[in-house]
């Protein structure tokens, strides 16, 4: 069973575009993902893979990221968007190689700015609102509560009128 294939097929059946989220720098099960110590300490798995000096982000990209992206971009039909996250230590050349792969396999796929190094098609603004209209494409990335993902113990949520105000503010300034 392939849940992503089922989801992609159902999205198309319902007239929705389909895309993927991909975290470039948060793979806790890979020995080559560095933490960017001391700036971003604790962002990778130093318990199982403590040798920060020998971690090799390029090896991780070549061995895991590019093959996974190839799978995502070739097995699920047309991909409308790749929504990347956490590119803190990705070099410009690494971002370029990822972008080239996407352009070759899915030439119409949108790529957000979190591919890193200014190579996205549009900018992500996280947990804040713009102060003025921005003519360049951008997206506000705002949570509805206190967490990025589901937490059954979460009890802090923005009130509906606040979420409507935020959405109105974003759209009025040209954002998504």
Region spans (language model):
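Mature catalytic domains of secreted/periplasmic carbohydrate-active enzymes
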Residues: 1-176
């Amino acid at each position: 069973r392939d849940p992503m294939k089922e989801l992609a097929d159902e999205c198309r059946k319902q007239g929705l575009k389909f895309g993927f989220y991909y975290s470039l720098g948060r793979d806790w099960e890979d020995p080559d993902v560095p933490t960017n110590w001391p700036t971003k300490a604790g962002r990778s798995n130093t318990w199982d893979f403590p040798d920060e000096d020998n971690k090799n982000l390029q090896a991780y990209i070549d061995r895991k990221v590019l093959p996974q992206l190839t799978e995502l971009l070739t097995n699920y039909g047309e991909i409308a968007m790749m929504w990347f996250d956490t590119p803190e230590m990705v070099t410009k050349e690494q971002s370029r190689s990822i972008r080239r792969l996407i352009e070759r396999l899915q030439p119409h796929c949108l790529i957000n700015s979190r591919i890193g190094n200014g190579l996205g098609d549009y900018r992500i603004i996280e947990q804040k609102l713009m102060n003025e209209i921005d003519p360049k494409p951008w997206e506000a990335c705002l949570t509805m509560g206190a967490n990025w993902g589901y937490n059954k113990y979460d009890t802090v949520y923005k009130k509906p009128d606040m979420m409507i105000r935020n959405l109105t503010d974003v759209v009025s300034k040209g954002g998504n």
